[in-house]
Amino acid sequence: FYKTAYRMPTFNDLYYTDMGNPALLPETTTQYNVGAVYDRTRTEGIFRNLHLNADVYYNDVRNKIVSWPQGPQFRWTTINLGRVDIRGVDAGAACTLAFPHEWTLTGKLQYTYQEAIDVTNPSDTYYRDQIPYIPWHSGSAIIALSWGTWSLGYSFIYVGERYNQQENIIYNHTQPWYTSDMTLMKEIRWGKARLRFTAEVNNLLDQDYDVILNYPMPMRNYKFGLAVEL
């Protein structure tokens, strides 16, 4: 498909303390996308569903609005990048297996390749460099095992190497990171209400990583929840 998009700066983009930029221009994007989807569903046997998808896209972005920490104090700054060319591929797969005694296994894979280069000014030192904090490679994997009203899930997220400033030099290189999470869920009927109890372990492997340089993410942590549907 082909479409154009228009994005006005948000109030925070313009006026957030020490970060906003009242001089920001609106962002405009021209998008081109070609994709394919395959979906197969069965009501019998082990293999119940198979889903495959792939998209190839190109975005021509003018006055792209971006924010990242800059300078010796790593203060957040919001600016326009005059022109950014974005090319990428998204691919995904999902499969559901059904076993006797209400056992179900679901798996999902997602992969993205993205090249987002600054083509504003050929005289800039970062001309045709990848823009900050956009990885070339990223992906995720999810596995969920269900039995009756119980469900156990595992998720893995990977983000490849990036650069934390506009110049793609060794000093600005940022290492890849990955993290694993697990979730246990139990549903209970109570009268007309449905209760859903959840227990999560996030950053299961206790990884030390930064999504943004010098902004460390939490180490292993736990979360418990209860949702009620009436």
Task: Identify the meaning behind each predicted range.
Residues 62-63, 67, 105, 157-165, ...:
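C-terminal beta-signal and adjacent terminal beta-strands/loops
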Residues 49-60, 77-163, 192-194, 205:
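Gram-negative outer-membrane beta-barrel transporters
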Residues 4, 26, 38-40, 44, ...:
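Residue-level signature of outer-membrane beta-barrel architecture
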